[in-house]
Amino acid sequence: MDSIVTTEDTIAAIASAISIGKGGVAIIRVSGKDSINSCKKIVQTKSKYAWESHRVFHGFILENKQNKFIDEVLILVMKSPNSFTGEDVVELHCHGGIILVNKVLQRLLSSNSRVRLANPGEFSQRAFLNGKIDLTQAESINQLINASNTRSAELAFSGVQGKIKKKINDIKNDLINQLCEIEARVDFEEDFTDFDYNKYLKNIKKVKEKIELLIENAKRNSYIHNGISIALIGKTNVGKSSLLNLLAKKEKAIVTNIPGTTRDVIEVNLTINDIPMKIIDTAGIRETHEQIESIGIKKSFRKIKESDFIIYIYSLEEGFNKEDKKIIQEIPKEKLITILGNKKDLIDCKNINSNELKNTILMSIKNNDGERLLIDTIIKKCGLKQVENINIFLNERHLTNLSSCLSNLNDTDVIIKNKLPFDLLSIELRDGIQNLSKITGQELTEELLDNIFSKFCIGK
């Protein structure tokens, strides 16, 4: 076991969610070498199990020395090193009113000058520093707390279990094996004439494929956790607001036959197939001299740039014309896009030009004909059709370090193909390994660690 990092001060905070100001139970967590003694000063108990490790016992919180009680509580003690933080930890399980639990917390803080309010994420930071969890597990705990849907929670929990660390360490070990062979030759100045370049390139290719798969999944599982922002784009009166109302299952936008009714952006947050989606209704795009409508149209183009996915809607009655083509040309080529032909109930689909049908969803928004096909198309194009195959959540920090490692490995290819000195190969492999180590927290500065944990909630 890693040695336990001790600090002079003991920290305390409310660890349970009481955002509405009341609940059945609230938990105050205390961690540090003075946690038990500090709690002893404010707790009165007759339990025979009092202050034993991993025992729950009953007691009262004393307001003062005159034996006036604040609350009746359950107390859980977890002695070092067998606790979340690796330090002595005490949990006070109080009644859940915010006024009451804050009073208990203030009583605790005033009992000992070495007990202070915890900083955001400080319990998890101490757990990390004491080797109880790695950085990906700490981040996954925060991700789990902030999960917006069940699939996001499942992915976060896999990180809590250490699955991210395992995948990263497997890749790192592959690179360490390659580095050992290279450095043995460099250190002993052996001749590289018998070095199997093809075998090396083959092994590195396998490692790169593993990293590329993780990067690909990282982009997809961002949709699962953060959601997909979907902009409804098109000319006036093609059915954008009607589609928003259909997906929302309620009237969120005003629908009329008057062109230019929608003049501002309307956003609705939904969960479809357990994936959060933000549907954005925009002003219809057309030439206009009306000032307010023009502002709305500018916002439409802004939303095109900001959104993950574009649904371009046109009227099958009018057909896909030059104006539609001109608008689509304004959409960045890297954007995911689906073209939707609306009002199929008003035309004979057999008469539609076959080129117009290519990669187009035909729909009658008014009659709710084609909604399932549209949703399936969005999920497929976002790479979420086999969402069950994505089994870990990688955040932007992980993605950055994986991309840096991949760049290091691509540089080793260049070194070998151009027959550059082998010590350069060793440097790139070491840098690649270092980038992977940053993911699990082995190669990070104190400042960066503080920044990561500052984004956690106070009681975690």
Swiss-Prot record:
Record-listed (6S)-5-formyl-5,6,7,8-tetrahydrofolate binding positions: 29, 91, 132, 460
Main location: cytoplasm
GO cellular component: cytosol
Source species, domain of life: Bacteria
Localisation per UniProt entry: Cytoplasm
Disulfide cross-links: none
Biological process terms in GO annotation: tRNA methylation; tRNA wobble uridine modification
Summary of the function given for this chain in its UniProt record: Exhibits a very high intrinsic GTPase hydrolysis rate. Involved in the addition of a carboxymethylaminomethyl (cmnm) group at the wobble position (U34) of certain tRNAs, forming tRNA-cmnm(5)s(2)U34.
Family: Belongs to the TRAFAC class TrmE-Era-EngA-EngB-Septin-like GTPase superfamily. TrmE GTPase family.
Assembly description: Homodimer. Heterotetramer of two MnmE and two MnmG subunits.
Protein name: tRNA modification GTPase MnmE
